[in-house]
Regions:
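Hydrophobic small-molecule pocket/channel-lining residues, especially in calycin-type beta-barrels
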Residues: 21-157
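Enrichment for repetitive, rod-forming helical segments
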Residues: 9-10, 40
Length: 157
Protein backbone atom coordinates (compact mmCIF):
# COMPACT_ATOMS: atom_id res chain seq x y z
CA UNK A 1 0.00 0.00 0.00
CA UNK A 2 2.86 2.35 0.86
CA UNK A 3 4.36 1.70 -2.58
CA UNK A 4 1.04 2.57 -4.26
CA UNK A 5 0.91 5.89 -2.39
CA UNK A 6 4.50 6.65 -3.39
CA UNK A 7 3.71 6.02 -7.08
CA UNK A 8 0.56 8.15 -6.76
CA UNK A 9 2.48 11.01 -5.11
CA UNK A 10 5.22 10.96 -7.77
CA UNK A 11 2.64 10.91 -10.57
CA UNK A 12 0.72 13.79 -8.99
CA UNK A 13 3.93 15.80 -8.57
CA UNK A 14 4.92 15.20 -12.20
CA UNK A 15 1.51 16.27 -13.48
CA UNK A 16 1.54 19.38 -11.29
CA UNK A 17 4.97 20.38 -12.59
CA UNK A 18 3.99 19.71 -16.22
CA UNK A 19 0.71 21.63 -15.97
CA UNK A 20 2.11 25.14 -16.54
CA UNK A 21 4.25 23.90 -19.44
CA UNK A 22 1.30 22.20 -21.12
CA UNK A 23 -0.93 25.22 -20.51
CA UNK A 24 1.47 27.53 -22.34
CA UNK A 25 0.66 25.90 -25.68
CA UNK A 26 2.28 26.85 -28.94
CA UNK A 27 4.37 30.04 -28.61
CA UNK A 28 3.11 31.26 -32.01
CA UNK A 29 -0.55 31.36 -30.95
CA UNK A 30 -1.97 34.82 -30.26
CA UNK A 31 -2.18 38.27 -31.78
CA UNK A 32 0.96 39.99 -33.08
CA UNK A 33 1.43 43.61 -34.15
CA UNK A 34 3.99 44.52 -36.82
CA UNK A 35 6.69 46.93 -35.63
CA UNK A 36 7.22 48.72 -38.95
CA UNK A 37 10.13 50.81 -37.58
CA UNK A 38 12.14 47.71 -36.59
CA UNK A 39 11.29 45.76 -39.76
CA UNK A 40 13.25 45.83 -43.02
CA UNK A 41 11.76 45.31 -46.47
CA UNK A 42 14.23 44.89 -49.33
CA UNK A 43 13.44 46.23 -51.85
CA UNK A 44 10.22 47.45 -50.19
CA UNK A 45 7.90 49.19 -49.73
CA UNK A 46 6.71 48.25 -46.26
CA UNK A 47 3.04 48.06 -45.29
CA UNK A 48 1.75 50.92 -43.15
CA UNK A 49 0.41 48.54 -40.48
CA UNK A 50 -0.40 44.87 -39.89
CA UNK A 51 -1.89 42.64 -37.21
CA UNK A 52 -1.35 38.88 -37.34
CA UNK A 53 -3.77 36.55 -35.52
CA UNK A 54 -2.56 32.97 -35.09
CA UNK A 55 -5.03 30.49 -33.61
CA UNK A 56 -4.34 27.13 -31.96
CA UNK A 57 -5.22 25.21 -35.15
CA UNK A 58 -2.49 27.04 -37.10
CA UNK A 59 -4.84 29.36 -38.96
CA UNK A 60 -3.13 32.73 -39.50
CA UNK A 61 -5.00 35.88 -40.55
CA UNK A 62 -3.16 39.09 -41.44
CA UNK A 63 -5.05 42.39 -41.58
CA UNK A 64 -3.72 45.88 -42.08
CA UNK A 65 -2.99 48.72 -44.45
CA UNK A 66 -0.64 48.13 -47.37
CA UNK A 67 2.07 50.52 -48.62
CA UNK A 68 -0.46 52.23 -50.93
CA UNK A 69 -2.76 52.99 -47.98
CA UNK A 70 -5.39 50.39 -48.90
CA UNK A 71 -6.85 47.78 -46.55
CA UNK A 72 -5.33 44.31 -46.93
CA UNK A 73 -6.45 40.97 -45.54
CA UNK A 74 -5.09 37.51 -46.29
CA UNK A 75 -4.20 34.32 -44.50
CA UNK A 76 -2.96 30.78 -44.54
CA UNK A 77 -2.76 27.65 -42.44
CA UNK A 78 0.59 26.93 -40.79
CA UNK A 79 0.45 23.32 -39.58
CA UNK A 80 3.83 21.73 -39.05
CA UNK A 81 2.94 18.48 -40.82
CA UNK A 82 4.74 19.20 -44.12
CA UNK A 83 1.51 19.16 -46.15
CA UNK A 84 0.50 21.88 -48.60
CA UNK A 85 -2.38 24.10 -47.48
CA UNK A 86 -4.08 26.78 -49.59
CA UNK A 87 -3.54 30.48 -48.93
CA UNK A 88 -6.51 32.86 -48.68
CA UNK A 89 -6.89 36.36 -50.06
CA UNK A 90 -4.36 38.51 -51.90
CA UNK A 91 -1.17 37.30 -50.24
CA UNK A 92 1.70 39.67 -51.20
CA UNK A 93 4.00 36.92 -52.51
CA UNK A 94 1.24 35.62 -54.79
CA UNK A 95 1.50 32.10 -53.34
CA UNK A 96 -1.36 29.63 -53.57
CA UNK A 97 -0.05 27.03 -51.10
CA UNK A 98 2.19 26.77 -48.04
CA UNK A 99 3.87 23.80 -46.33
CA UNK A 100 5.48 24.01 -42.89
CA UNK A 101 8.04 22.11 -40.85
CA UNK A 102 8.92 22.77 -37.22
CA UNK A 103 12.63 23.31 -36.64
CA UNK A 104 12.35 23.68 -32.85
CA UNK A 105 9.61 24.54 -30.33
CA UNK A 106 10.03 28.27 -31.12
CA UNK A 107 10.98 28.08 -34.80
CA UNK A 108 9.19 26.98 -37.97
CA UNK A 109 9.97 27.17 -41.67
CA UNK A 110 7.22 27.81 -44.23
CA UNK A 111 7.65 27.19 -47.94
CA UNK A 112 5.21 29.03 -50.20
CA UNK A 113 4.50 27.98 -53.79
CA UNK A 114 3.07 29.99 -56.68
CA UNK A 115 1.95 28.26 -59.90
CA UNK A 116 3.59 25.06 -58.66
CA UNK A 117 7.00 26.71 -58.17
CA UNK A 118 8.81 27.87 -55.05
CA UNK A 119 7.90 31.50 -54.27
CA UNK A 120 9.21 32.14 -50.76
CA UNK A 121 10.79 30.57 -47.70
CA UNK A 122 9.88 32.21 -44.40
CA UNK A 123 11.44 31.35 -41.04
CA UNK A 124 9.28 32.26 -38.03
CA UNK A 125 11.07 32.54 -34.65
CA UNK A 126 9.49 33.40 -31.30
CA UNK A 127 11.80 34.83 -28.62
CA UNK A 128 12.39 32.78 -25.45
CA UNK A 129 10.21 35.16 -23.43
CA UNK A 130 7.41 34.75 -26.02
CA UNK A 131 7.00 38.48 -26.61
CA UNK A 132 8.63 38.93 -30.04
CA UNK A 133 8.10 37.12 -33.33
CA UNK A 134 10.75 37.57 -36.04
CA UNK A 135 10.02 36.50 -39.60
CA UNK A 136 12.78 36.24 -42.19
CA UNK A 137 11.21 35.91 -45.64
CA UNK A 138 13.20 35.35 -48.83
CA UNK A 139 11.62 34.82 -52.21
CA UNK A 140 10.81 36.24 -55.61
CA UNK A 141 8.30 38.95 -56.46
CA UNK A 142 5.16 37.78 -58.29
CA UNK A 143 5.20 40.92 -60.45
CA UNK A 144 8.78 41.12 -61.75
CA UNK A 145 10.45 37.91 -60.53
CA UNK A 146 13.14 39.84 -58.67
CA UNK A 147 14.37 38.59 -55.29
CA UNK A 148 13.22 40.09 -52.00
CA UNK A 149 14.34 39.72 -48.40
CA UNK A 150 12.09 40.92 -45.59
CA UNK A 151 12.96 40.81 -41.89
CA UNK A 152 9.87 41.66 -39.89
CA UNK A 153 9.49 42.17 -36.15
CA UNK A 154 6.18 41.53 -34.42
CA UNK A 155 5.17 42.25 -30.81
CA UNK A 156 2.74 39.99 -28.96
CA UNK A 157 -0.42 41.80 -27.92
Amino acid sequence: MKRLWTVFAITLLALTAAGPVLAQGDPFTGTWKLDVAKSKYDPGPAPQSQMRTWDASGQVTIEGVNAAGKPAKYGYTLKDDGKDYPTMGAIPNGAQTVAVKRLSPNKIEANFTRDGKHAETATFSVSKDGKVLNILAKGTSPTDGKPFTNMTVWEKQ
